[in-house]
């Protein structure tokens, strides 16, 4: 960042969001992004759109940013409104500006091991696993969830260091028993507290990708909203060798990877 600033290069992240729910998981992510950007001297510009925005409106904004030579980094928060095809919108992001790595061209490059802007959440998961010091070669790694920008890229990335990878979903038969055999367990199913202690091999590395805002009893006869993951942290924590927290785990690491990609995109855009 300092070298870019010294050369007069402005690093900015343009983020598009379409929701009216100020308590959504996407807005939690937005707050983390803005805070981290400000701390690092990266300009953050949020393009807030209505939760009822249609494809033409959202696509038009993304195309405008993609074609703007002064814009070097673009991301689109999911989910988009139900009627909007996220694949089509993500395909409109210029690959060189796609700092979340969600354009189909960037995702495809993962399979071939080509250098590109890779999906941030998948990168964050890999960095967290690396931080534990575990040698993935020959280890059993199980991924719960097979979304196009999280589960599938993570599975492919785990294959590079020669882990034995099993890609599953919440409907996989005998899933708890399969999970208990895994040395590394990644929960990315989008189901609050799906993974319990019975799923976890003692000492396993468990990465919780999920983030949900749920209502719980506040102890005073009412309810309150709290943030939880796909893992039941209370039961899994004592069993796992490592459990990434929610909040405070994959979320901040994903923001860090996003900003790493943002700086890389700004550098590549330099004449």
Regions inferred by a protein language model and the residue ranges of each:
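Anion-binding alpha/beta catalytic cores of soluble intermediary-metabolism enzymes, centered on
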Residues: 3-5, 9, 72-136
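Glycine-rich phosphate/diphosphate-binding loop of Rossmann-like nucleotide-binding domains
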Residues: 23-35, 116-205, 209, 214, ...
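Short beta-strand segments
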Residues: 17, 75-79, 144, 208
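Charged, compositionally biased N-terminal leader segments and the immediate start
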Residues: 1-20
């Amino acid at each position: 960042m300092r070298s870019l600033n010294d050369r007069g290069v402005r690093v900015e992240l343009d983020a598009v969001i379409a929701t009216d729910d100020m308590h959504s998981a996407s807005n939690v992510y937005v707050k983390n992004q803005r805070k981290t950007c400000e701390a690092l001297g990266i300009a953050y510009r949020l393009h807030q759109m209505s939760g009822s925005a249609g494809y033409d409106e959202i696509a038009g904004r993304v195309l405008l940013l993609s074609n703007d030579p002064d814009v070097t980094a673009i991301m689109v928060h999911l989910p988009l409104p139900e009627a909007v095809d996220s694949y089509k919108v993500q395909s409109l992001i210029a690959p060189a500006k796609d700092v979340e790595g969600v354009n189909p061209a960037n995702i495809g490059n993962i399979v071939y091991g080509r250098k590109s802007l890779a999906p941030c959440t998948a990168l964050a998961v890999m960095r967290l696993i690396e931080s534990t010091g575990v040698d993935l070669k020959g280890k059993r790694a199980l991924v719960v969830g097979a979304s196009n920008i999280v589960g599938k890229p993570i599975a492919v990335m785990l294959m590079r260091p020669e882990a034995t990878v099993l890609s599953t979903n919440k409907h996989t038969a005998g899933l708890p028993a399969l999970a208990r055999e895994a040395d590394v367990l990644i929960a990315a199913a989008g189901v609050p507290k799906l993974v319990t202690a019975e799923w976890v091999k003692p000492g396993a590395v468990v990465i919780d990708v999920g983030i949900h805002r749920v209502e719980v009893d506040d102890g005073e006869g009412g309810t309150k909203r709290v943030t939880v993951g796909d893992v039941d942290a209370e039961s899994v924590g004592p069993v796992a060798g490592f459990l990434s927290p929610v909040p405070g785990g994959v979320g901040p690491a994903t923001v860090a990877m996003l900003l790493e990609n943002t700086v890389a995109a700004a550098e590549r855009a330099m004449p």
